[in-house]
């Protein structure tokens, strides 16, 4: 499996691939054999031919935002959040269930929440979620009318501060 660090320049060979949409997200893939989907996954053995690393890695710093500040312009961007934690009901859970990609929920001090989506194939999928509060960064996505954060590596979570009690509404009122 190819892995690209954030900021890696890549070339994509698109000949023979098709654009499709799924859950409000545009994707590039193979022609789909299933009429439910507009395109399919690129076979694993084709990935090294279709995606090639180019010279140079651009140093990337995430934009630090509040959950309430998320907008469509941030989709596909490397972003970060401070003073966040996973919701109480998910403490003790792994980043991902073993049988399917999974959703977890991040909350900030104002009570705003964001879905965190983790692939069951992520190297850190079986590790427990951080139990404290702190900093988390990832790539923002959009699926079925909801923002979702894709964390690249568990090291992108520095959440060792004490937990907080979120406000009851998203206006920051008690």
Task: Label the predicted regions.
Residues 1-174:
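OB-fold nucleic-acid-binding modules
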């Amino acid at each position: 499996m190819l892995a690209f660090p954030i900021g890696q320049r890549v070339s994509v060979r698109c000949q023979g691939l098709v654009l499709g949409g799924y859950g409000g997200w545009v994707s590039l893939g193979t022609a789909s054999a299933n009429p439910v989907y507009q395109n399919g996954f690129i076979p694993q053995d084709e990935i090294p031919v279709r995606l090639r690393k180019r010279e140079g890695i651009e140093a990337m710093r995430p934009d630090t935002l509040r959950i309430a500040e998320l907008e469509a312009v941030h989709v596909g961007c490397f972003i970060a959040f401070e003073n966040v934690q996973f919701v109480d009901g998910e403490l003790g859970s792994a980043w991902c269930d073993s049988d399917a990609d999974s959703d977890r929920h991040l909350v900030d001090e104002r009570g705003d929440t964001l879905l965190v989506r983790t692939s069951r194939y992520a190297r850190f999928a079986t590790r427990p979620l951080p139990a404290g509060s702190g900093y988390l960064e990832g790539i923002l996505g959009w699926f079925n009318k909801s923002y979702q954060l894709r964390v690249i590596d568990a090291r992108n979570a520095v959440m060792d501060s004490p937990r907080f009690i979120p406000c009851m509404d998203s206006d920051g009122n008690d």
